[in-house]
Amino acid sequence: DQGKLRLSDKFPLMIPQRSARFSTPVAPVRPGTMMSAQGLIELSITRSDNPATDALLAAVGGPAAVNRWMRKAGLSGMRLDRDIATLVRDDGEFNPATTVDLRDSATPLAMVQLLAGLHQGRWLSASSRSVLLGAMERCVTGKRRLPAMLPQDARVAHKTGTLSNTSSDVGIINTPDGRAIAIAVYVTGQGGKPNRDYRIAAISRAVYDGYLTESSSLRRTASR
């Protein structure tokens, strides 16, 4: 939207190279296949493709550039410290169920504020917003997470995340009556990934039912 990059511009996938954990401040990568920015966005969001995500991160100027944008956008409680190759290589340094590591973190509130701003068009043009939300609607990872227990007529645009002993799913639930619910669920521990997925799905359904119940109650009150 700033005119610096176009969706048709091509950038190389950033392929991680073998290296020992914590052996370097930044994990080594090599350039791979050239892809358009739009293709990289599609891979990054729909399939949580790490080389595609790192390609986009490099194209916009790295973690520092992303942090500057977040500050300008008024988003606190969210920070990026490493590229994905380094984050994944060094994953497991801390157990997220018992230790809070503030690096590369976002509070659920900050994530919901980002999602709400994206949905409301606070920062992006309609066309750019459509690209991101469209990719989120086509997400193929996390089918057992946010969407799993929702009614079939509820549409979900979401993005998953998975690291050692932690799973997440964040997105926007669109209800049949046209409302949008921004939701961010992070789960640690729980005895394994299937249990974490189930917990995310259950929370998603509870939030969905809660909003629908509240809406029905307000309509009944207004009709009296």
Locations of regions flagged by a protein language model:
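Short, well-structured active-site flanking segments
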Residues: 1-18, 125-128
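Structured C-terminal helix/loop/strand segments within mature extracytoplasmic catalytic/sensor domains
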Residues: 58-59, 63, 112-224
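Short, mixed-charge aromatic SLiMs
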Residues: 15-27, 134-145
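A charged helix-plus-loop insertion that forms the helical arch/lid used to bind
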Residues: 28-35
